[in-house]
Amino acid sequence: MADVFEFELEGHESQASPQRHAYHYDNCTEIMEDDHMYSNVADGQISAPPPSSSYMEDPMMESIQLCASAINPPNVRVGPEDFQLLKVLGKGGYGKVFQVRKTTGSDNGQIFAMKVLQKATIVRNQKDTAHTKAERNILEAVKSPFICDLLYAFQTGGKLYLILEYLSGGELFMHLEREGMFMENVAKFYLSEIVVSLEHLHQQGIIYRDLKPENILLDAYGHVKLTDFGLCKEEIEGDQKTHTFCGTIEYMAPEILMRCGHGKAVDWWSLGALMFDMLTGGPPFTAENRRKTIDKILKGRLTLPAYLSNEARDLIKKLLKRHVDTRLGAGLSDAEEIKSHAFFKTTDWNLVYARQLEAPFKPNIENDEDTSLFDARFTKMTPVDSPCETNFSLNGDNPFVGFTYVAPSVLEMMNKGGHGGISVAHLASSMSRAGAAKSPRKPGDPETASILHGGHSNLFGHGPNSEAPQAFGYGIGSQMTTTTAGGAGIQQPYQSFSGGYPEDDAMDTSTPRASESRETTTGNGSTTTTRPSNVGSSASTPIPLPKRVM
């Protein structure tokens, strides 16, 4: 697939205040009691509270039994031995993604996706280590029906484990590969749910920065779930800008390429590129190599096929405005500008938020273990969690102290299963930072901000010495790399274009472009794979369905 980059530009974010991360979890359980009612305060005679037996006899008081099973309910702490490997969903330099079945606890028998990461590979780079911990924090903090959910996180001496919900609908990329392109009503469904998911991230002060078909998964009902938060930027308020050079080239906004600072509006450019991709068969700007692709993004004319509706053409043109100030969604109202566009005039946004719109494609799943919508190149592999050559102490200098996590939803399930009367909220606060993560973040509060959104990572990228093919949907995919074709490293982000932007007006045409190529870069170098460009046709001409090549 396409190249993904991340560069921290000196002189900008390097001057930001250092972030502190709360990775230590208390092992105690806090029990809150109501204030006692005291009498005779006026004359200085304060009666002692009644003995505890009096409370137990009061039918209005709730009994709380303190016992080992209540404070430390069984099966809260999990490990690799609690999961049965079923299938390989993906593989990369940092590790593998498996389909697994839980074999213990109240969720015994449930199917999950298990991402296994090699510590030795991650700790080679201090930044990778920090990003990995921050990525896990984002997965914990951001809860939305349109975001892939994290259920457990744990570690061994040599590996990190993330247990995510299994999304049997596969990647949107695979469906586009099969169909070639989508009809407008189909694209509208997916775009509406993507808009809502980006809106949620923006409201949390997060820029996504890597929207593309590979990072969009479908659940068993055909609804959208975003995954891969490795390129996110947190703590962005209002029109605040950041200066990291990152993203997947074909979907990157011009202001990222120009290194002039960017904000949340880069996600709306990517939405426009994705919309174009869905409706035409490929991204709007592609070429035979990376440099020419960037040149087209910065200076090329946008070519729109004639078969698109006026509303679709107008929305694409307004999203792909090179001048940020004129781009739809760049204002303070953010997603509201896009939701009110004529392309979505028939969309009931209340139904979108409630996930009550009927999906155009409902996966034909035989059972919970069905992996037919994932790449057979992976699922035919024998699932083996390979042994580690290097192990790290789980105490002392362990760089991943505090990585363990159990979702509140899991604790709630266990509580209903009869593990005592301790409040689930107390259990959650003792096992993780879930309580703090759900608290409103106050602008300008660095400690709270770091708890909520600890940073960005390349946790979901493939690491060095990775093997092709790569998995995309669950994130062991394209690495943020500085490797170019032939292995030459990029020392600086693209900077050859020094002039102003060309006109933003798109050129409508019915002339299809020739197929162009996208580069796929791995840690060992890069290869080039061909993907179709936008396909144009007249309204009376049958629309060819191009075949995507992965």
From Swiss-Prot:
- Residues binding ATP are L89, G90, K91, G92, G93, Y94, G95, K96, V97, K115
The record's subcellular location field reads: Cell projection, Axon; Perikaryon
Q: Mind listing the GO biological process terms from this record?
A: determination of adult lifespan; nematode larval development; positive regulation of autophagosome assembly; positive regulation of gene expression; TORC1 signaling
> What's a GO cellular component annotated to this UniProt protein?
perikaryon
Active-site residue numbers: D210
Changing K115Q: what effect?
A: Probable loss of kinase activity. Enhanced axonal regrowth following axotomy of PLM neurons
Knockout-associated phenotype: RNAi-mediated knockdown causes an increased lifespan and resistance to starvation, slower growth and a decrease in brood size. Causes a decrease in the number of germline progenitors. RNAi-mediated knockdown in adults causes increase in lgg-1 positive autophagic vesicles. RNAi-mediated knockdown in a daf-2 e1370 mutant background results in daf-16-mediated up-regulation of stdh-1 reporter expression in the intestine and a synergistic increase in lifespan.
Keyword Chloroplast recorded: no
Q: Where is the Protein kinase domain?
A: 83-344
Main EC class the enzyme belongs to: transferase
Top-level taxon of origin: Eukaryota
Q: Which UniProt keywords apply?
A: ATP-binding, Cell projection, Kinase, Magnesium, Metal-binding, Nucleotide-binding, Phosphoprotein, Serine/threonine-protein kinase, Transferase
Query: Cross-referenced SMART domains, in alphabetical order?
Result: S_TK_X, S_TKc
Record EC number? 2.7.11.1
Q: Which PANTHER family match?
A: RIBOSOMAL PROTEIN S6 KINASE
* The family this protein is said to belong to: Belongs to the protein kinase superfamily. AGC Ser/Thr protein kinase family. S6 kinase subfamily.
Kindly provide the name given to this protein in its UniProt entry: Ribosomal protein S6 kinase beta
Origin organism of this chain? Caenorhabditis elegans
